[in-house]
């Protein structure tokens, strides 16, 4: 019974969010808000939104609760604006290239035969450990890919990293639609 109560509470939050989302006019604030909300709903530690610019993916929005807690007052997260090509080599690039979502249980154990790889350098640079990843393309109604939503490290009730569930995927897909609608306005 507790799961259905939790599910109902989450649905109420989603509906409330959807009712208030269009009051936000600033695209940057809106996308940051969407990213923050989906991370809360699926209990994910981190996430990013990438936007397509000149055949590359550019990270525009990044959030990471673990790293945020470790910052000294006045410090900012160590993310720099960076871009990489849309191709099959990276996880986000693969999703933008193929238009298909990817759900990865352990970023460090991706089978060798797959074309995409996890870039461990980001974890090394930021002293973080990425494990579970849910990456979904952001598409316009005509099918054009305009970005990628990536949610990282789903957490269980004890704060341990877990795989993303089917239910998480439903919520992430819903919020990806919100991102698409926001990007459509730009």
Language-model regions, residue ranges each:
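Signal-transducing coupling segments at domain and membrane junctions
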Residues: 105-132, 155-162
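A short, aliphatic-rich beta-strand micro-motif
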Residues: 131-140
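Soluble sensory domains of the PAS superfamily and closely related sensory modules
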Residues: 93-102, 108-112
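Short regulatory alpha-helical segment in sensory/regulatory domains of signaling proteins that mediates
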Residues: 18-22, 34-43, 49-51, 76, ...
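GAF sensory/regulatory domain recognition
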Residues: 36, 48-87, 109-110, 116, ...
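Amphipathic alpha-helical "output/dimerization" segments
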Residues: 144, 159-184
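Flexible loop/coil segments at beta-strand boundaries within sensory signal-transduction domains
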Residues: 139-145, 154, 186
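Signal-transmission linkers at sensory-effector interfaces
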Residues: 1-33, 40-41, 59-61, 182-185
